[in-house]
Design a protein with these regions (language model features):
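Membrane-proximal helix-turn-helix segments that form the acceptor-binding/catalytic region
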Residues: 79-80, 107-108, 137-160
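N-terminal subdomain of nucleotide-sugar transferases
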Residues: 1-49, 218-221
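Short His-centered aromatic/hydrophobic patch
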Residues: 92-98, 117-118
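A charged, aromatic-enriched C-terminal amphipathic alpha-helix characteristic of glycosyltransferases
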Residues: 36, 324-359
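Short hydrophobic beta-strand element within catalytic cores of glycosyltransferases
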Residues: 280, 289-292
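Aromatic "clamp/platform" in nucleotide-sugar-dependent glycosyltransferases that forms part
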Residues: 272
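Conserved donor-binding/catalytic core segment of Leloir-type glycosyltransferases
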Residues: 5-7, 193-211, 217-221, 229
């Protein structure tokens, strides 16, 4: 009997946690596969009332485990539950301690281990060491040790799945002896809402320097006659100098965030580097045009990539000048997103994970 386990740091609806696109993607893929095989999603939580519980969401079993102070301690916590379930396949996305759990599942249970990349830098060597070196020598040492474990685990994966051509190229270069496949992000179809009467631009993301929230503030100053909405949390010092036409919401429930995205005229993404941000795809499925400073979206007819702030400003000005342009482009983007990130992506993930396709 096939029994599938999906590993994720947090449930995407966990209000006590710091949620990323990886958490949402693992959840979406686990929900899809639960329609075909017994599927278990293992997540950690800071909500003590949920720790130890198994809650069924549709056909998906969600296991809530204790969230330890140090990430490396997730390895024994998650591995213990995996050994109890005895899965035939373990899926994990992004570079974390859970990558090690996936590899140990293969070693101890002979489970198939599939690893999926998130951002491009996740394929690099010693990612955690570079990140933690800014926070002191002790944390850098632990980061180095965790990085070594993760790298060993990545090399032991049965299959590596990339989400775009750039990632596939990096993965093929690093894991030249492995099979590399590409599956784009999987999306549910969100509810749609009527556009705001006034031209409105939205930005959604973490308030980190690599997300460049300051650029969105500069855009708001460039278009004082328009409304600018910002949803996210993190270092609010980065957006201290925001103008009066920019409204900051902080952290919102996902449903409320999607409502704002759907009602806005344009979504702007200013991140330095990402895979395929979920928020971009969600905007497309809501019928909201997207302009991205650095991120490319492959497989669709419309080019969301700007590459230069002057180009972004020019294209934004053109869209904000006409509600009809926004609505027409939004409908075209929605059709493309439905085809690529709902229909084709669904079939791709089923081919990758369900037997007999996953014979490596």
């Amino acid at each position: 009997l096939d029994r599938l386990v999906f590993l994720s740091d947090f449930h995407p609806n966990d209000e006590s946690a710091f949620i990323t696109g990886s958490h949402l993607q693992v959840y979406q893929i686990a929900k899809l596969l639960s329609e075909y095989r017994e599927s278990h999603l293992l997540v950690s939580t800071n909500d003590q009332s949920k720790v130890g519980k198994v809650i069924k969401e549709g056909e998906l079993f969600v296991h809530y485990l204790r969230n330890p102070r140090y990430e490396i301690l997730k390895i024994p916590i998650f591995l213990k539950r995996v050994l109890e379930i005895e899965p035939t396949l373990v899926f994990q996305r992004g570079r974390s301690a859970l990558t090690v759990v996936g590899f140990l599942s293969k070693v101890l249970l002979s489970s198939t281990f599939i690893w999926s990349s998130n951002a491009q830098e996740g394929i690099d060597f010693l990612k955690y060491t570079r990140f933690l070196s800014r926070k002191g020598k002790i944390r850098a040492i632990f980061g180095f040790l965790l990085d070594l474990l993760i790298n060993i685990s990545l090399e032991g994966a049965d299959l590596v799945v990339a989400q775009n051509e750039e990632q596939r190229g990096k993965a093929e270069e690093r894991f030249w002896w492995k099979e590399i496949r590409m599956c784009k992000n999987l999306q549910e179809i969100p509810e749609r809402f009527e556009k705001f009467e006034k031209p409105t631009v939205i930005w959604v993301g973490r308030l980190d320097e690599n997300k460049n929230p300051k650029i969105f503030i500069d855009l708001a100053k460039e278009f004082p006659e328009c409304e600018f909405l910002m949803v996210g949390y993190g270092n609010e010092e980065l957006i201290r100098d925001r103008p009066g036409n920019l409204k900051f919401f902080g952290k919102l429930p996902r449903e409320e965030t999607l409502r704002l995205i759907s009602s806005s005229w344009v979504l702007v993404n200013t991140s330095e580097s990402e895979g395929i941000p979920n928020v971009i795809l969600e905007a497309m499925l809501c019928g909201t045009p997207v302009l991205s400073l650095n991120v490319r979206v492959e497989g669709i007819a419309y080019n969301v990539f700007c590459g230069d702030i002057k180009v972004l400003i020019e294209r934004l000005r053109n869209l904000l000048s006409s509600r009809e342009k926004v609505l027409n482009l939004g409908e075209n983007l929605r059709r493309e997103a439905l085809r690529v990130f709902v229909e084709e992506s669904r079939e791709c993930w089923l081919r990758v994970i369900l037997p007999p396709y996953n014979t490596f």
